Amino acid sequence: MDNALEFVNSRLGTHEYWDKFYDEELTNFEKNGGEGEIWFGRLCEAKMVEFLIKKASKDAIICDIGTGNGSVLRKLSNCGFLNLFGIDYSYKAIELAKNISSKNYSNNKIKFLLANISEDKLESELKGKFDILLDKGTFDAISLTNKSDLDDEIPRNELINLLENELLCFDCELPTNNNFEFGGCKGNTYIGCVFKWRG
């Protein structure tokens, strides 16, 4: 693909990094009850939830890919969404998400599952199950993986296999050219994108 984005390898693209990160987050939660990092901030998460409230049925079967601590799913649950799943390839992330949800959200029925979309072996029980997929950072992590360790087609194919009929995928990590400067630092804002798959 001539216009493909080029990313450099980074420790953020390694399984070891995320296991260590979520091990520390889990320790912090057990010590002080803090839920930990909200990737791209609460505003980004709020925009995802706001969009889904407007556009999706409360009965839609939603999967958060790379769920981390499960924060966005808890927000959706609080807004009345009923069929929520979070998958992550880090066992510690899944343990953290389950612990937070069971301790702080006693009525929460979110299902958290250990799964790796960058491997061609997702559990058959997940295939063809979901109406909506959410991504708030997983594309970044996959893009930063050592390319010799990753077949570029597998994540795309595995995502398609997760879907029942149509895909509504909310990806809120794509950088824009909208630059700004504040306090002597330069930065970019982020945008949200929704993709609909018709197979």
What does each of the following model-derived ranges do?
Residues M1-G199:
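Preference for well-ordered, secondary-structure-rich cores of eukaryotic proteins
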